């Protein structure tokens, strides 16, 4: 068909306004779409705008800009540090509060490792930490990465001279530009210090003691008979009966402190209560754990090894959340050691895990301690990995410290690029001396002065599970979503219907399969590396 046949028969049949309106409509829609795109882009950009005040040039006392210093080359480095967290508001830079990072940054500037032109902005130096510690928490080893001037061979010594005694730099190592100490940290070692008297069974007459003894009568043979704890409390009772009359002991045990405005420190009964508690504390500090009880505690902590669902060992995690599954690589419980003027016996618990959730370590220590002191079967810990919610109390924060981050996987890449591996074990002697002087001694002293662990476990033993902390009667509810009390969990009866965590949990199986694949891959990598490092035999040499 020709073009002439396609044209309309009459010119008046063509309405030019229609074409104009159509073109205008298309143009309007296109402009509106472009405008909407610009609005969306602006919204996205607003989300990423750094609204914090920007740092300007350095000024002198009169407000005039200071001259810039000559620029020296900066290198990406990993700085290995240790610190006592007492008196600091955590690790992370948080002005105007004193933090570990603010003290380190100030020392870097004063030592010349960071130019004064960059002394008012951490971001200019790419400051990053491997593990963030909270207020008052210590670290024998932690790591920060940043860009630093390291031309001076004595830079480490100069930085340490500018730092307070409670913060030390162990070493400074060059790393490649892509190094991110937080993301490339493959695992972490934590340490928890626990006085052994924490493993003594509940005090006779306490609520938890009565619940345990009643459950033993109903279901004999489930819980251990803790003869060691019975002997301890009998010795204390005998000593107390020699120093106080029966009437005085009854009055002491029934004593309720008055309101603060009515409190009288010189009151005769209060003074007797004070002496009674001092006598009990003296017996606790003289306590020495038996080999059998220490073995029970070690068996309890070993239940955490491997991949498990730790949703009950943190806050705000549901059983079905994949992030609740964590992998514990190793747990070591030391032999008991006596330290300090009070001659208290302690044990050290070291936990090596890929990653940890909020309060996880404190709840793990608390659960293992309660299982041991109440005589429960150690296998009961595996029930806490199941769907049922259980309220596990947190052990005191006092004993917790970061031992060191581990960069096992990334160290291989560093060595390939010609850099030294990040390894805290090279400085173990220095770290141990520092921990003993600036961390352990402070923990021991605070425990003696405040009786932190005694207060915690005394509260657990006397806690009323019916009225709770608010004095309101709790409703009797059932179902896995309803949080159950730890006190039901610790008796011979346990929580009705609660069984070991199901082995068929998909996420746990997937994680275990991943662990096996990772181990096989590492083995193959080591094997191939060994073979590649063997000198090749040249044909000439072979012929000779």
Swiss-Prot record:
Its main location: nucleus. Formation of pseudouridine at positions 27 and 28 in the anticodon stem and loop of transfer RNAs; at positions 34 and 36 of intron-containing precursor tRNA(Ile) and at position 35 in the intron-containing tRNA(Tyr). Catalyzes pseudouridylation at position 44 in U2 snRNA. Also catalyzes pseudouridylation of mRNAs. This is tRNA pseudouridine synthase 1. The gene is PUS1. Residues 1-74, 495-544 are annotated as: Disordered. Binds 1 zinc ion per subunit. It is found in: Nucleus. InterPro entries: PsdUridine_synth_cat_dom_sf, PsdUridine_synth_TruA, PsdUridine_synth_TruA_a/b_dom, PsdUridine_synth_TruA_C, PUS1/PUS2-like, TruA/RsuA/RluB/E/F_N. Its cofactor is Zn(2+). Its EC number is 5.4.99.-. Belongs to the tRNA pseudouridine synthase TruA family. It catalyses: a uridine in tRNA = a pseudouridine in tRNA; uridine in snRNA = pseudouridine in snRNA; a uridine in mRNA = a pseudouridine in mRNA.
């Amino acid at each position: 068909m020709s073009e002439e046949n396609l044209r309309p028969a009459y010119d008046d049949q063509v309405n030019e306004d229609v074409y104009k309106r159509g073109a205008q409509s298309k143009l309007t829609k296109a402009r509106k779409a472009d405008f909407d795109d610009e609005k969306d882009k602006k919204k996205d950009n607003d989300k990423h705008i750094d609204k914090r005040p920007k740092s300007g040039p350095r000024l002198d006392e009169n407000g005039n800009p200071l001259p810039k210093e000559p620029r020296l080359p900066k290198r990406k480095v990993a700085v290995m540090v240790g610190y006592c967290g007492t008196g600091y508001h955590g690790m992370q830079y948080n002005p105007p509060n004193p933090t570990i990072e603010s003290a380190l940054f100030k020392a870097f500037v004063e030592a010349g490792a960071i130019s004064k032109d960059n002394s008012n902005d951490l971001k200019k130096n790419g400051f990053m930490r491997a593990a963030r510690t909270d207020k008052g928490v210590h670290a024998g080893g932690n790591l920060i990465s940043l860009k630093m001037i390291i031309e001076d061979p004595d830079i480490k010594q100069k930085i340490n001279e500018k730092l307070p005694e409670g913060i030390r730099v162990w070493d400074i190592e060059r790393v490649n530009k892509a190094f991110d100490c937080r993301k490339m940290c493959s695992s972490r070692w934590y340490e928890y210090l626990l006085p052994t008297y924490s493993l003594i069974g509940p005090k006779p007459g306490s609520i938890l003691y009565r619940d345990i003894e009643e459950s033993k009568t109903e279901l004999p043979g489930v819980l251990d008979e803790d003869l060691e704890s019975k002997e301890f409390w009998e010795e204390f009772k005998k000593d107390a009966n020699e120093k106080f009359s029966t009437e005085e002991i009854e009055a002491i045990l029934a004593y309720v402190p008055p309101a603060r405005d009515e409190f009288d420190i010189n009151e005769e009964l209060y003074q007797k209560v004070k002496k009674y508690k001092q006598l009990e504390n003296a017996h606790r500090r003289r306590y020495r754990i038996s080999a059998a009880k220490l073995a029970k505690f070690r068996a309890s902590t070993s239940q955490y090894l491997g991949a498990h669902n730790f949703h009950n060992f943190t806050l705000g995690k549901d059983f079905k959340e994949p992030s609740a599954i964590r992998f514990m690589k190793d747990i070591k419980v030391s032999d008991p050691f006596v330290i300090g003027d009070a001659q208290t016996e302690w044990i050290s618990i070291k936990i090596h895990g890929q990653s940890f959730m909020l309060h996880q370590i404190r709840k793990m220590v608390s659960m293992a301690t309660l299982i041991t002191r109440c005589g429960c079967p150690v296998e009961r810990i595996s029930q806490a990995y199941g769907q049922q919610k259980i309220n596990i109390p947190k052990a005191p924060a006092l004993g917790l410290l970061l031992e060191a981050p581990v960069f096992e996987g990334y160290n291989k890449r560093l060595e390939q690029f010609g850099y030294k591996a990040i390894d805290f074990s090279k400085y173990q002697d220095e770290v141990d001396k520092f921990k003993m002087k600036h961390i352990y001694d402070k923990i021991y002293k605070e425990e003696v002065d405040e009786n932190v662990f005694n207060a915690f476990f005394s509260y657990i033993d006397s806690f009323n599970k019916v009225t709770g902390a608010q004095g309101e009667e709790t409703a009797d509810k059932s179902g896995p979503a309803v949080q159950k009390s730890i006190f039901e969990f610790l008796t011979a009866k346990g929580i009705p219907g609660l069984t070991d965590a199901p082995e068929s949990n998909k996420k746990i199986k997937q994680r275990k399969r991943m662990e096996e694949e990772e181990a096989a891959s590492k083995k193959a990598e080591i094997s191939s590396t060994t073979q590649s490092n063997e000198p090749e035999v040249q044909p000439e040499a072979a012929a000779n």
